[in-house]
């Protein structure tokens, strides 16, 4: 009987894998046909203005249209996740070469067409921002291996002195702070057992509002905390790279948004779910003693954060540029050399797919710019919404990205849309920083659905939070985020 049930389970899994593969193949074929159809239509109608020097140049028109068709294909693949989004990222340089996309260059007074070389198409995968993020993963690995993340969390929660309100806010605060430096997913997963330990002392039925407040507080604080630093969330790095922002420059933008959204989130959750904080609770503590390695880890963390924040001043002192990536790689080298984490630890805790996704997004950006596809797309969008007031455009873009990432990967959305909206901003005479930062920050502000972010899925998986709870609170927070992100960035750069 047992053997039969195991066989049935294996067959069910196999059928599921086959149906998933079939779905992926069908979507790839449909995406290819739709993209090719767009290419044919654009070649026949040419519904956009062409620079005077390219009028009558059919090769230029075909090159632009190939770039736009590639953009559509990648968009369908990333949003549908027909294959893993990392694989789609790796497709981008391959497709650019196969499709014969290139750029026009002037040589000896004459204009000639040059096909993309594979080395050019792959250059995005060696971008310094990728290594900055890798250093962030190495730092997070060291904190996790030495249990310093948990030690900090337990210490702050223990300060509540049995006060449920203070403990609840403390859990959310720790989640937010750790998420500035550690993966949002890892932070939420680590904080969940601490929260469940507190909630186990309450009545699940009578204190349901308290359950939902604390659990959603953890999920949302993890997402909000990721806004504070470049390494907090992948979309931050994508936007920062487009704007050539360093670690400190990003913090000047991301940190205020984080500090505004955090209290608004807790207030919103309190008003909606009306938790009962009158209970006295017992805080379970775990003895994590200070060791030489833990002290060294704290020192490495503090020095790395200091170097990131004060990179410009350090550059002036040392006489060479202290780049974010240089600091990150130095931290990774030190971490392994002094033995506070092994290479295996770092490799296991690094999300390599995110790093490749970065590279694919940067490759796509280069292809769109060099083929003039992004310029043409910007003109077309500008013609449609060019008469709208700037503040309306800003709020519409904020709403678009925030609700879009309820259904799609925030990193993939940012990788696709940041280069596009950078060009659209120029065509609309809007400072590029406004739309790029709205895409970069807004991509992390998805609060409404369990599938929107890993932290949402983690707390939903406990069974204590219903989807209607998340939708109710998330809708309000999405609207708040649209206003906060849109208005703050607009006021900063308009």
Q: At which residue positions do the language-model features occur?
A:
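Juxtamembrane helix-boundary/capping and inter-helix hinge elements in multi-pass membrane proteins
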Residues: 144-148, 158-163, 198-211, 239-249, ...
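Membrane-interface segments at loop-to-transmembrane junctions
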Residues: 13-18, 157-162, 207, 217, ...
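Alpha-helical transmembrane segments and, especially, the helix-loop junctions at the ends
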Residues: 137, 175-192, 209-247, 262-270, ...
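C-terminal ends of transmembrane helices
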Residues: 73-80, 141-159, 201-203, 272-276, ...
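Hydrophobic transmembrane alpha-helices of multi-pass small-molecule transporters
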Residues: 1-132, 249-379, 476-482, 486-494
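Membrane-embedded alpha-helical segments and adjacent helix-loop junctions characteristic
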Residues: 87, 91, 95-205, 350-354, ...
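Alpha-helical transmembrane segments
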Residues: 201-212, 271-288, 337-346, 431, ...
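C-terminal transmembrane helix pair
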Residues: 205, 251-258, 360-364, 385-494
